């Protein structure tokens, strides 16, 4: 990935809960959970 220009990389304490973090996790966590549930269902034999 390309690095940001040196002007924007001033050392500071970056927040964890950004809009990008929120968007990635609200989409990613249910997707991973759903894929895990589908994978687990493949091994269920009734």
UniProtKB/Swiss-Prot annotation:
PROSITE patterns: CYTOCHROME_B559. The chain crosses the membrane at residues 21-37. It holds the Pfam family Cytochrom_B559. Its cofactor is heme b. With its partner (PsbE) binds heme. PSII binds additional chlorophylls, carotenoids and specific lipids. Signal peptide: none annotated. Keywords: Electron transport, Heme, Iron, Membrane, Metal-binding, Photosynthesis, Photosystem II, Thylakoid, Transmembrane, Transmembrane helix, Transport. GO terms for biological process: photosynthetic electron transport chain. GO terms for cellular component: photosystem II reaction center; plasma membrane-derived thylakoid membrane. HAMAP family: PSII_PsbF. This is Cytochrome b559 subunit beta. It comes from Synechococcus sp. (strain CC9605).
């Amino acid at each position: 990935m390309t690095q940001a220009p040196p002007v924007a990389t001033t050392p500071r304490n970056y927040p964890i809960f950004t809009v990008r973090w929120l968007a990635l996790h609200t989409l990613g966590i249910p997707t991973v959970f759903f894929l895990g549930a589908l994978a687990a269902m493949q091994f269920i034999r009734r």
